[in-house]
Each structure stands twice: as C-alpha cells, then as structure tokens.
C-alpha cells in the first residue's frame, strides 16, 4: 500500500524527523488558506499522487506570492499529471501539499528497504539527492553507500554517524542527520514498511537537516495490525479493478497485454505469464485465485478480466493441490455462461480430480480449448489471441 507525501511527512514528524511546515489542500480556496496560515515569502505547491517524478512533470511549483499560489493551485488541481512512473495516461491530481519554502544548500538521498538476500534491513544513502537513485546507480554507483542493519540491534549511533559523513554531512550537522536517520529507521520498522525514502534530505544554509520529501510503501500483509496506516488509503489512486478484486480475496494486477490469466498460486501465475511471453504473447493481468476458489470467486475473476477491453483470449492454468480441479471446472463453466464469454478460452488443469474436471469441461458444450502442459497452453492461447485480431 502506498501513501501520499504529506501523509509520509506526518509519520516522519511523529518520529522526530524534521520536515517543513505544510498543509494539505483539496481545493484552490484551501490552498490559499494554507498559504496564508503558513506565511511567506516563499511557498511550494506540490501535486499529491502516488508516483515519483512530479517535479519534472510540472506538478511541483515554487510560488513567491499568494497570486502565484492561486495560479499554480488552479493549474495543478485536476490536471492529468504524467511522470515516468505513471505511464502515458498519467494520474489525476485531486489534492495538493502547500509547504513553506526551504533554503537548500545540499541535497542528499536516504532510503530503507527489506533486503531479501540478507533477510535484514538495508539502508541506502547517497550524496546525490534530488534525482532518481536508479540514475545514480547507473552512472555513479560509487556514490551509493549501503548498510545492512540487524533488526535486533537497530541503527546504532556509530553507524548513523558514519553514513552521514560518507554522504557529505558536515560535522556540525551530523547529530541532526543521526536523528533523522534513526527516526526514519524507527518509522520503517514500527509501521511494517517495505520502503521508506527521503529524496531529498537537505542541508540548509544554516546547517539544518530537513526531509523535503517522503515516500512510504507498506506490506499489505501487515495492515491488519496498522489501522492508522489503512486510514491513509486513497482509493482514487488505486486501480478500480484491483479494489474490486480485493473484495473477493483475489490478487489482481492490471497489465498492458491482451491475454487474460487466471491461475492459482502466485508462483504458478508468474511462471504462466513468463511462458506466455516466451511464446510471443503479452499477459493482460496477474490474477491469483488462491487455494480456496469458489464458483462465485471464479465468476468474479472472469468479470474482472473481461472488464479490460484489450483482452482477446483467456488462459486458465490450475494446479489441483488444495484446490480441486472439478471445483475449478464447475466455476469455469458457470463463469463462462454468466459472462456470456465470447473470447477464446484455454484451460489447463493438473492435480486433484483432474480427470473429472476435464470431463466436466468436455461435456459442457462450451468451446473450451484444452491443453495438457503449460507450454501447450501458452502456445494455444497466444495463437487464439492472434486469431482474434
């Protein structure tokens, strides 16, 4: 789950990480009121969407008068903001952050992620803040410093000070940087975040350390114990189909292809998508129905896939372990009839009650294309989708 910058800064503030004074605004009138409350002489008008690159896309403006605030708020609110992370369709801006200006002397970068290799927390920091860390990694990787943190120990004073000095924090500001780094770490750990990023973390002309931006991603599997994080959820920023899928306990992610995929198990779903691509096809979605799929669940899964007008064929790939193949067959038959399926459907089933499931499909009278192996299923669905063009 992602949250907005201003929400991330609320979290940082709770952990004593210095952030600029700022007020969220949902209208031009609220933006003007916020600017007046903050006082001048400089304000920053920032679009709030779940994507990076807002500045380059025209979503961050420095205002030097109240009239500027009004102009920028009017232009940004409601705009379809396109960045390198949104795709060409962009995202509509429904809220702003009006923030006091900052005296930027130096921009730094710091982030925390879960490192799957070490199974610990990795802190990454760089003297090259204010730009995409991917660019730094590609062109000047030596400027990225990584520290693997043992969760039982946490981020020690010595390690925090060492990282601060490595990224160019002067001695007079190291104590402030330590406070910011340890606060970020504590926020990351306490909230079950999967990513916490400050870009940039700035040094001001007076030597102050301030988090000028904040990005958090949270582990959705841990949200049950963080109602305060769930309260930050902005459904306008999420895919409508993914929201609908969550109501039926379906793991669904929209993609750009034309072949719908219905699979049980995330690993098999990924392998299915890879195999489709291997034979020249493009998946239209990731869809894991899990181990407890019912007829209703399968029907809803079909409905979700077919809401995408680009879907020209569907592949159902099921391994019957916990999930019985005859139950899936019943769901596929019922779903095909319920949605009046008109696109080609390829079904591959292996495992528990496989023969019964296959017989049910064969006796259904529906034009279902059977496949025995994953490679055969992928080839058939790619060919079927090509035949629809």
Swiss-Prot record:
Its cofactor is Mg(2+). ATP binds at residues 46, 53-55, 99, 102, 107. The keyword S-adenosyl-L-methionine does not apply. Pathway: Carbohydrate metabolism; tricarboxylic acid cycle; succinate from succinyl-CoA (ligase route): step 1/1. Mg(2+) binds at residues 199, 213. InterPro entries: ATP-grasp, ATP-grasp_succ-CoA_synth-type, ATP_grasp_subdomain_1, Succ-CoA_synthase_bsu_CS, SUCC_ACL_C, Succ_CoA_ligase-like_bsu, Succinyl-CoA_synth-like. It is an enzyme of class 6 (ligase). Residues 9-244 form the ATP-grasp domain. Substrate binds at residues 264, 321-323. Its EC number is 6.2.1.5. GO terms for molecular function: ATP binding; magnesium ion binding; succinate-CoA ligase (ADP-forming) activity; succinate-CoA ligase (GDP-forming) activity. It holds the Pfam family ATP-grasp_2. GO terms for biological process: succinyl-CoA metabolic process; tricarboxylic acid cycle. GO terms for cellular component: cytosol; succinate-CoA ligase complex. Keywords: ATP-binding, Ligase, Magnesium, Metal-binding, Nucleotide-binding, Tricarboxylic acid cycle. Binds 1 Mg(2+) ion per subunit. Heterotetramer of two alpha and two beta subunits. Succinyl-CoA synthetase functions in the citric acid cycle (TCA), coupling the hydrolysis of succinyl-CoA to the synthesis of either ATP or GTP and thus represents the only step of substrate-level phosphorylation in the TCA. The beta subunit provides nucleotide specificity of the enzyme and binds the substrate succinate, while the binding sites for coenzyme A and phosphate are found in the alpha subunit. Belongs to the succinate/malate CoA ligase beta subunit family. This is Succinate--CoA ligase [ADP-forming] subunit beta. It comes from Cupriavidus pinatubonensis (strain JMP 134 / LMG 1197) (Cupriavidus necator (strain JMP 134)).
């Amino acid at each position: 789950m992602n949250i907005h910058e201003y929400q991330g800064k609320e979290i940082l503030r709770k952990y004593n990480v210095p952030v600029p004074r700022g007020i969220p605004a949902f209208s031009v009138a609220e933006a003007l009121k916020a600017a007046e409350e903050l006082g001048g002489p400089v304000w920053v008008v920032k679009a709030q969407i779940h994507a990076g690159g807002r500045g380059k896309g025209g979503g961050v403006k420095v205002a030097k008068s109240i009239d500027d605030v009004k102009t920028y708020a009017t232009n940004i609110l409601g705009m379809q903001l396109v960045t390198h992370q949104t795709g060409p369709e962009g995202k509509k801006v429904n809220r702003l952050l009006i923030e006091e200006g900052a005296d930027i002397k130096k921009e730094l970068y710091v982030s925390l992620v879960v490192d799957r290799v070490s199974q610990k927390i990795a802190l990454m920091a760089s003297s090259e803040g204010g730009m995409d860390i991917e660019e730094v990694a590609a062109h000047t990787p030596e400027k990225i410093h990584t520290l693997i943190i043992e969760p039982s120990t946490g981020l020690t004073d010595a390690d925090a000070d060492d990282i601060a000095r490595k990224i160019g924090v002067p001695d007079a500001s190291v104590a402030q940087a330590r406070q910011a780094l340890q606060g970020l770490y504590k926020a990351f750990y306490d909230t079950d975040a999967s990513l916490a990023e400050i870009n940039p973390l700035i040094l001001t002309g007076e030597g102050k350390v301030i988090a000028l931006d904040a990005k958090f991603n949270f582990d959705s599997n841990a949200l049950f114990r963080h109602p305060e994080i769930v309260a930050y959820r902005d459904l306008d920023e999420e895919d409508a189909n993914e929201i609908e899928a969550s109501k039926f306990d379906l793991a669904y992610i929209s993609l750009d292809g034309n072949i719908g995929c219905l699979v049980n198990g995330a690993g098999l779903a990924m392998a299915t998508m890879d195999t489709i691509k291997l034979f020249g096809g493009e998946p239209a979605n990731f869809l894991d129905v899990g181990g407890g799929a019912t007829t209703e669940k399968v029907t809803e899964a079909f409905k979700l896939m077919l809401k995408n007008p680009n879907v020209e064929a569907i592949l159902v790939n099921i391994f019957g372990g916990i999930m019985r193949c005859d139950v899936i067959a019943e769901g596929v038959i019922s779903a095909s009839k319920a949605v009046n399926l008109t696109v080609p459907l390829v079904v591959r089933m292996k495992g528990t009650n496989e023969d019964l499931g296959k017989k049910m499909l064969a006796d259904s009278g529906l034009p279902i294309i059977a496949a025995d192996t994953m490679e055969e299923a992928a080839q058939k669905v790619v060919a079927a989708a090509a035949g629809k063009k």
